[in-house]
Amino acid sequence: QLEVYARVLIRFVHAVMMCRSDVEAFTLGTRLTRITRELSARNPDSALSRAANAVEDWSGGTRLGEGIKEFNDQWGIRGMARGATVLILSDGWDRGDSETVSEQMERLHRVTHRIVWANPLKATPNYEPLAKGMAAALPHIDNFVEGNSFNSLKDLSKLLTE
């Protein structure tokens, strides 16, 4: 589902990284991949190409709980997530265990300043967060926003600067 939006969302993250030096970027499919270095290229096409080459599980489905656990264990809890605004760009579809998603989102939420989740599907008329990963994550999210258009990304940019 997110495939349609993935390139635009990664370009958005690249643009944010070009404006701020304290941004880290990861992709989460069936595994967690840090792409901060790849997205540091000034040229957006080069950055996107480098990121795509670094991600082995592009379009391979999503295991949100396991990936968020890996982030928490390796990067987040004792490091970069502490006191940070964490932005998750996802449709919430998950191939893993929803209980793990809930547990790991709760764990992440305890150490962050806030969690912002941008879901491209949220703009769909009559959308309800019924995907099991999205439903499990929702109680631990501070801002649940759309992520499907230029205007929604502009609004997201404003939200991130608050």
Feature map (PLM): residue ranges:
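Exposed acidic/Ser/Thr-rich ligand/metal-binding surfaces
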Residues: 65-111, 145, 155, 159-162
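Active-site proximal loops enriched in glycine and acidic residues that flank catalytic Cys/His/Asp
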Residues: 6, 27-30, 88-92, 97, ...
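Extended hydrophobic-aromatic, low-complexity segments
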Residues: 5, 18, 25, 36-37, ...
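Von Willebrand factor type A / integrin I
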Residues: 105-162
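Short glycine-/polar-rich loops that comprise or flank the Walker A/P-loop
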Residues: 19-23, 83-84, 111-114, 140-141
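Von Willebrand factor
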Residues: 1-84, 86-87, 126-129
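A short acidic, amphipathic alpha-helical/loop segment
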Residues: 8, 12, 100-107, 133
